[in-house]
Each structure stands twice: as structure tokens, then as C-alpha cells.
Amino acid sequence: MLKLICIVFLVTVLTFVVGEDTLDPAEYGCPSDVDMAELTEKNEVCLRCEDFHKEGVAFTLCKTNCFTTEYYKNCVKDLEEAGKETEE
């Protein structure tokens, strides 16, 4: 029984890990022919923004409508300003 529980747990963890490595443009409201490198870069901005603001909703708001919202633009601005402050 313990082996079965361990196997189920391992499969579940691997499913989540594999799922995080692939980005689905439709999940972000982007066209299917979007540049995946650009999508990955913008996704990283949103992840950093979520970490910076410590808000659970930051990532969702940031990626809405294929990263075209004011929230995404503000995230970019906030991260740039935070980078400038650490340089000083």
C-alpha cells in the first residue's frame, strides 16, 4: 500500500513539473502563433512581479489578455524601478 501511495505521489509531482515547463498561448489569451521566446520572457516578468509584490493575484492579472493590460505595464515599470534602486 505504501508503494502505491509513493507511486501516485511521484506521478502527481512529475505531472506538475512537466506542466510548468510548457506554456500554452491560449492560457494567456494569446494567438497560437505567438513567439514562444517572447511569451516565456513575459511570463518571467509576471513571475518576478508576483514575487516582488507578494500578491497571489499578481501573476494572473499580469498575464491577462496576452500581457496587454496596464497591470503588466506597471509590473515592468515596478521591476525596472526596483532594479535602479538596487544599483544605487
UniProtKB/Swiss-Prot annotation:
Subcellular location: Secreted
GO CC annotation: extracellular region
InterPro entries according to UniProt: Crust_neurohorm (IPR031098), Crust_neurohorm_sf (IPR035957)
Residues in coiled coil: none
Tissue: Expressed by the venom gland.
Statement: the UniProt record of this protein carries the keyword Disulfide bond: yes
Record's keyword terms, sorted: Disulfide bond, Secreted, Signal
Signal sequence bounds: 1-19
Disulfide bonds: C30-C66, C46-C62, C49-C75
Similarity comment: Belongs to the arthropod CHH/MIH/GIH/VIH hormone family.
Further information: Co-purifies with latroinsectotoxin.
Purpose of the protein: May increase the toxicity of alpha-latrotoxin and/or other venom components. Is non-toxic to mice and to the cockroach Periplaneta americana.
UniProt name for this protein: Alpha-latrotoxin associated low molecular weight protein 2
Organism of provenance: Latrodectus geometricus (Brown widow spider)
